Amino acid sequence: MSNYTVVKYSSEHYDEWQDFVRMSVNGTLFHEQKFLSYHDEGKFEDCSLMLYCKDELIAVLPAAVLQRGDRKVLKSHPGTSYGGLVFGTIPKLKAVIDCINAVEEYARNNNISRFEFRQAPKIFLSTPIDQIDFALVQLGYEREDQELSTCYPLIEYRDIPIEDMVKLFENDGRNKVRKNVRKAIRAGLEFRELDNSEIDKYYEILLDNLVRHEAKPAHSLADIKKLKELYPERVRLYGVFVAGNMAAGYLIFNINSNGWHVFYGSMDYKYQVERPTTFGLFMLLKTLADEGYEYLNMGISTEDGGRVVNWGLLDFKESFNGTGIIRTYWSKNL
């Protein structure tokens, strides 16, 4: 324990942090300071931490401090989908425990009385490191919430003809992926990456979708444009077009070399009969598979910390041969 030093991140550590995350065993786009920087200054009270052992950087933790009533909470950075500790190499269990203890000690010394965070999905790890979860249980952390996300293994679709890929999907139930994809192909639907001039139209469709579901976007139009500027290769927008008109769109983030995360999928409902979201997701799977990626994560289909399942949304995702992965929220009073 005495060998560990916790340093609060500042801009002078930017290059060190970036290099560490990119070379780590479990870092993602959402752990990079470059990504976190798109948020307006002052939106969050940043408390990202760097953990050193004998002057060697061992782990980093993107985080912020929240004021909840009369108590301060250290939380996985609220500006990301997931966070948690990032390690440079496969850590031994003792090192994981020591790092968590060091974070707790830092928190207590700064009048922080609770620690909450969520790890990245295991599909984005370069190697399994379940010793992190094991250490959390050993140290008294609780699984506060568990969300169910859907992911797609892509290797099966790599370098095969479109028609052969279509045959791999179900053709029964409500979604009828095989039938609807073939129908879209016959109708001449176009799938392609959007250019920057088309982002406004995409966002207009997205807002209309969210209003239908009484929801609000996590990103403003300016946010999406800024992220696209920061990461021109790792933030992509794809559209599906019917007779030249944008009918659906997907915003995806390149999490790391393992795969991508769908942040928003949306559809112009006047084209619903053409099933543009079905065709769009099918072509996303094919595109990313042919580029050599392992997984596409479609995001959660649950609400209220996993207590409520959106069965219609989950049915759509599972009809594309999707499988469930757990996103766990850990917490502990200090």
Give the location of each predicted region.
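Aromatic (often tryptophan-rich) hydrophobic motifs at membrane interfaces
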Residues: 50-52, 92, 97-104, 224-334
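Short glycine-biased active-site loop of nucleotidyltransferases that positions the nucleotide triphosphate
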Residues: 41, 74, 306-309
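Short alpha-helical functional segments enriched in proximate histidine and acidic residues
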Residues: 20, 106-110, 287
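A conserved beta-strand-loop-helix scaffold within acyl/acetyltransferase catalytic domains
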Residues: 4, 8-54, 58-70, 121-270
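Short, solvent-exposed loop/turn segments at the edges of secondary structure
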Residues: 78-82, 145, 312, 325
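A gly/proline- and charged-residue-enriched helix-loop-helix capping module
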Residues: 79-126
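Short, high-confidence coil segments that cap the C-terminus of an alpha-helix
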Residues: 44-46, 110-112, 290-293
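Conserved acyl-donor/pantetheine-binding loop and adjacent beta-alpha core of acyl/acetyltransferases
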Residues: 65-84
